Amino acid sequence: SAASDVYKRQVIDVKGALSDTAKKIFRGTLDFKRGCSGSVGDEGDYAIQLSPKTKNISLPLLLCTEDDVSGNHASSAGQLDMNTIYFLMTRGFSLEDARLIVVEALIRPLIDRLDESVREEVLAEVRRKLDTKEK
């Protein structure tokens, strides 16, 4: 049934960009308890560090007391890929616009899941924050 399918698949999807001296700790837990046979859980934490002074800690945790489940976790954090930035700049984008394109490409799938009534407001706020940070 549709109601029971909600509990068959759960996703934790964290994406973002850290600037200046920002620090972030991700603690995600997927707990497969008895009775959840056939369930799938995914958790991921992906961050772009826009400054070498940022700190990103990712602590995904999978707990399981059931058979026949699938649990996946992933984590990735790093500086902007300068090859990508260079590529965009050779296509006419400024450094600032290239940075925004890369960050937006990371977080856009999450923004697109938001209710339409707030989507543009959230995207505008992200752009505003990136525009006011060190370049």
Give the location of each predicted region:
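Conserved beta-strand/loop scaffold segments within soluble protein domains that form the structured core
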Residues: 1-86, 90-93, 107-109, 114-135
